């Protein structure tokens, strides 16, 4: 028998996923340190920790979707929590990328004597910003327009149109990731080539990692939309994915200007 409640908040049931996620994160961290320092068993512990962590993420999000879609626990008051959490998460990611861009700008504006006082350091090859980087830059903002199209389609109750828009968004995202892979393959330097290589691959790679995560997020939203699991009133997961994607596509402009173009002159 289901007991009635006089409030609009969801009192969650006891869950094993917080502790399992913590153990997975611990194993991943310790295994990563052991692997980097060539300790025996480091690679095994790292692999097991990652698998355990990914499994926990999957089943935890599965439970959240069940609570919202099948059990109807996500009232308007409950939906505010994921919205605020998504916004704060994006703000924290902005701080991450800001730190990497700051490191690149600091190193290029005041090059040390160890690299000859010039930027880029002598002997370090740089990518031509007017080739693949320029071609890749407008793709993500275009995908941002497509995800906005999907949002408007969901609000209008046009399910098929929303699916088409999400397919277009994911397709553009995959093209962008492919271009970045080509760019890395053709790069004349590596991450170990002085501070230039370190900051270049760290900043652009971290952004590329965000693109991959956002693509997976949108693929899940596309599948749920295709199955009819999102409505005009209940699509918080899609809103979080759209906000995250707009963050990703806008940020793309900063590495092009500050790292590819200005930092590579």
UniProtKB/Swiss-Prot annotation:
Molecular functions (GO terms): cytochrome-c oxidase activity
Regions that span the bilayer: 16-36, 41-61, 84-104, 162-182, 200-220, 245-265
Keyword terms of this UniProt record: Membrane, Mitochondrion, Mitochondrion inner membrane, Translocase, Transmembrane, Transmembrane helix
Bilayer topology: Multi-pass membrane protein
GO cellular component: mitochondrial inner membrane
Gene3D superfamilies, sorted: 1.10.287.70, Cytochrome c oxidase, subunit III, four-helix bundle
Cysteine disulfide links: none
Gene Ontology biological process: mitochondrial electron transport, cytochrome c to oxygen
Chemical reaction(s) catalysed: 4 Fe(II)-[cytochrome c] + O2 + 8 H(+)(in) = 4 Fe(III)-[cytochrome c] + 2 H2O + 4 H(+)(out)
Pfam family, one: COX3
Enzyme class, spelled out: translocase
PANTHER family for the chain: CYTOCHROME C OXIDASE SUBUNIT 3 (PTHR11403:SF7), CYTOCHROME C OXIDASE SUBUNIT III (PTHR11403)
Family: Belongs to the cytochrome c oxidase subunit 3 family.
The protein, known as: Cytochrome c oxidase subunit 3
Native species: Aegilops columnaris
Gene responsible for this protein: COX3
